[in-house]
């Protein structure tokens, strides 16, 4: 009996050491990927061809996404159907970087890092409310 108890304690010790060596998020697969904007430059304008699809994937109002992009890029523009037209020449790298920043600031939950969020307005303050964990965080105004 004493031998079995000693073996069990040794087994638990080895098991604890193995768990300490594992990373925190070992097999977590992300189900959300930041959508890429497909853009073309025509003259002095940049057209994001799939802007409506991008905003739908993010579950956000296209006007809100556009307002953020315009502010970050320092330009003017508008939405026409599924496209966004921006004044100026911007590469798809610049646009996709700004979309990634938008996702980090206005889509992903700051507590659980899930994209299951909605923007609500409480007492004249925009809040990011997570549907997964219930967390609420104030947002920067646009």
From Swiss-Prot:
Put simply, this protein is called Translation initiation factor 2 subunit beta
Q: Which family does it belong to?
A: Belongs to the eIF-2-beta/eIF-5 family.
Q: What does this protein do?
A: eIF-2 functions in the early steps of protein synthesis by forming a ternary complex with GTP and initiator tRNA.
Oligomeric form and interacting partners = Heterotrimer composed of an alpha, a beta and a gamma chain.
Q: Which Gene3D superfamilies match?
A: 3.30.30.170
Q: Name one Pfam family in it.
A: eIF-5_eIF-2B
Q: Which domain of life is it from?
A: Archaea
Question: Is Flavoprotein one of the keywords UniProt gives this record?
Answer: no
**Which of UniProt's keywords are assigned here?**
Initiation factor, Protein biosynthesis
Which gene is transcribed and translated to give this protein?
eif2b
Gene Ontology molecular function, alphabetical = translation initiation factor activity
């Amino acid at each position: 009996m004493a031998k079995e108890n000693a073996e069990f304690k040794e087994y638990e010790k080895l098991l604890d050491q193995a768990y300490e060596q594992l990373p925190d998020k070992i097999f977590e697969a992300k189900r959300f990927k930041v959508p890429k904007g497909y853009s073309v430059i025509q003259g002095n304008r940049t057209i994001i061809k799939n802007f409506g699809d991008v905003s739908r994937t993010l579950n956000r109002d296209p006007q809100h996404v556009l307002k953020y992009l315009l502010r970050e890029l320092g330009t003017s523009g508008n939405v026409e159907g599924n496209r966004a037209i921006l004044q100026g020449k911007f590469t798809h790298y610049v646009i996709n970087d700004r979309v990634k920043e938008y996702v980090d600031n206005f889509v992903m939950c700051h507590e659980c890092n899930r994209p299951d969020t909605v923007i609500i307005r409480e007492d004249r303050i925009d809040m990011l409310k997570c549907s997964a964990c219930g967390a609420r965080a104030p947002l920067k105004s646009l």
